[in-house]
Curated annotation (Swiss-Prot):
MF terms (GO), sorted A to Z: 3'-tRNA processing endoribonuclease activity; ribonuclease P activity; tRNA binding
Top-level enzyme category: hydrolase
Functional summary from the UniProt entry: RNaseP catalyzes the removal of the 5'-leader sequence from pre-tRNA to produce the mature 5'-terminus. It can also cleave other RNA substrates such as 4.5S RNA. The protein component plays an auxiliary but essential role in vivo by binding to the 5'-leader sequence and broadening the substrate specificity of the ribozyme.
Keywords attached to this entry: Endonuclease, Hydrolase, Nuclease, RNA-binding, tRNA processing
EC number: 3.1.26.5
Protein name: Ribonuclease P protein component
Domain of life: Bacteria
Statement: the UniProt record of this protein carries the keyword Plastid: no
UniProt source species: Neisseria meningitidis serogroup C / serotype 2a (strain ATCC 700532 / DSM 15464 / FAM18)
Amino acid sequence: MDYRFGRQYRLLKTDDFSSVFAFRNRRSRDLLQVSRSNGNGLDHPRIGLVVGKKTAKRANERNYMKRVIRDWFRLNKNRLPPQDFVVRVHRKFDRSTAKQARAELAQLMFGNPATGCRKQA
């Protein structure tokens, strides 16, 4: 198992983010929203993160949320389809609610329609 999180697994350019948002394939829960593309032409998934200052004012809070999401992706990337994903944090979470954020991320990323995720056009 490869648990690294190298550059090839990240969305780095604005065009990469724009192409994912252009598909308008979004699902959201209480804390997170995940946009996904139909495919990226690669043999592995890639992820981009959006945590705005409106969500968390302090940089260390934003960094913690990104760290939790990156860690979940790093451990589960082998189970994901080769698509591009953009995860946007809607509401701030901390150590006490990180478990809920990980559970929501699993529901959103694996796209199980029985999980009650709200699909947005």
